[in-house]
Each structure stands twice: as C-alpha cells, then as structure tokens.
Regions:
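N-terminal Sec-pathway targeting helices
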Residues: 1-12
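Short, well-ordered helical secondary-structure segments
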Residues: 2-4, 38-40, 89-91, 200
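Hydrophobic alpha-helical segments of integral membrane proteins
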Residues: 12-14, 20
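Residues in intrinsically disordered, low-complexity segments of regulatory proteins
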Residues: 16, 25, 38, 51, ...
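C-terminal active-site subregion of NodB/CE4 polysaccharide deacetylases
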Residues: 20-53, 57-63, 134-137, 151-246
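Metal-dependent polysaccharide deacetylase catalytic core of the NodB/CE4 family, i.e.
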Residues: 48-49, 69-166, 170-184, 208-220
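Surface-exposed beta-strand edges and their flanking turn/coil or helix-capping segments
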Residues: 64-66, 88-90, 115-117, 196-198, ...
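A short, Lys/Arg-enriched amphipathic alpha-helix followed by its capping loop at the start of a domain
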Residues: 67-73, 231-234
Length: 246
C-alpha cells in the first residue's frame, strides 16, 4: 500500500502540472504517455511552441479558419480523407497552400484498435491517395498521425513509426517538446477553465514545452468559438510560437 502511494505521488509530481485540469483527465493513456515523456526529460526546443488542430473536417472548418485568421495563426486540420464534402475538401486544400497544416486522421474514421499492421498501413496509404485526388499536396502533409477514436496499441505505434511520423495520442497532456514520439493534446470546449489554462500555459512556457490544442468543430455542442479565441490569444500573449509545425 505504501509503495502504491509513493508511485501515485511520483506520477503527480512528474506529470501533474501538464494536465489541463488537475484530477480531471487521469486516463490510463494519459498516465502512460506522461510517464514516457518524463523518461524523455526536459525540452530540447529553443522556445515554447503551440499548435491548434481541429478534428474530423466537416463544415465547421470554416469557423475554424475564421477564428485562426482573426487571432493571426495558421490552424491544422485532422482530415478524414474519404468523408469530406467537396466544398470542405476544396477549401482545406486551398488553405494548405496558404500554410494550414494537414494531419492524417484515417480514411473513413474506422477504429484501428483491432486491425493488423497491413490493414493500418493500407488505410494510411489510401488516405494519402484520396487526399491527392482531392487536390492536396501530399508531399506537405504533416508527419503527424491521429489514430481514429484515440486508438493506441503497440501495432498502431509500430506502423506510425515505420511511416516516419509522430503520433498524436488520446492523452490529455502538455508535451515536453516537439521531439517525443507520442504527443498529448489539450481540449478546448465550453467548460474550459481559463484561469486554470493560463496557469498551465505559463508553466509550459517556462519549460519551453509544446502544447497542442484540440477541438472538434464537427460537434457543435463541445465547440466554443469564444473559449478558443480566448485560449489562443492568451497563448500568444504569454509568448508561445505558433510557427508551422515541420
């Protein structure tokens, strides 16, 4: 019992400051990725970086682009390659030419959890092909992959690593820097506590950490344009660099 208590205290000390709200996101995946990051050590980046990724690529992307333009940053879109309406695909492809980031999020958003390596690889390859058909520059797609539904298995990680990409996991964490394999991301929604967010961001900035913000404009009830603007402006005010991810 004492050993378990010491382990729990150790986990809190190692990754507690990197959670969006203390005690609210202690999922198994968050703890797992957080401990891996702790092993990685401190930041090797020259400054603190931030990035905003919106998932699922539906009509909500137009509001995302408007917010990004208003705040003065380049957004990134986690696209479901074969589920975009033509107007959405055409718009995101044109925004890519203006500097928006494109992240793979599956061909049809099917769960990879129970798939074998060949099935996952095929899904990734078909995603690239489908995006190329829709006018995307596949040579400039970010080397980041978000497995659909937050799936995270050894097989998925192995395939993504073999693709020469980094993985954005379902962990809700600030990242130590831009060089770890598995990234966490911080959700922004209607219930986001701005004071708690500012405290976390200040600590992240002081440590030259890398923050990925996550939204789902495809789900209006958990999408808050007001909170997103507030958080992004706050992040810029603190001093984070939104330089496009390479």
């Amino acid at each position: 019992m004492v050993l378990l208590l010491l382990i729990a205290i150790g986990i809190v000390l190692l990754i507690g400051w990197r959670l969006p709200l203390m005690g609210s996101e202690w999922s198994k995946q968050t703890i797992y990725v957080g401990l891996l990051d702790a092993w990685h050590g401190g930041s090797t980046d020259d400054k603190a970086y931030a990035m905003w990724i919106d998932d699922d690529s539906t009509e909500g992307v137009f509001e995302v682009k408007a917010i990004a333009d208003e705040v003065g940053i380049k957004p990134a879109f986690a696209v479901i390659a074969d589920r975009m309406e033509p107007a959405v695909a055409d718009s995101i492809a044109s925004w890519q030419k203006q500097g928006a980031g494109i992240v793979l999020h599956g061909l049809r958003h099917e769960r990879w959890k129970d798939w074998d390596e060949s099935q996952i690889e095929n899904d990734i390859n078909l995603s690239y092909a489908r995006l190329h058909e829709q006018g995307f520059d596949t040579t400039k797609i970010l080397k980041l992959i978000i497995p659909p539904h937050g799936c995270n298995t050894r097989i998925i990680r192995r395939v993504i690593a073999r693709q020469g990409c980094q993985m954005i996991s379902g962990a809700s964490l600030v990242n130590p820097d831009r060089h770890v394999f598995q990234f966490g991301r911080i959700g922004i929604g209607p219930d986001t506590d701005l004071d708690a967010m500012r405290q976390m961001l200040q600590k992240a900035y002081d440590r030259k950490a890398f923050v990925i913000f996550s939204t789902h404009s495809s789900i209006p009830e958990i999408f808050s344009a007001e909170k997103i603007r507030d958080v992004l402006r706050m992040t810029k005010e603190i001093g984070f660099c939104f330089e496009p991810y390479q």
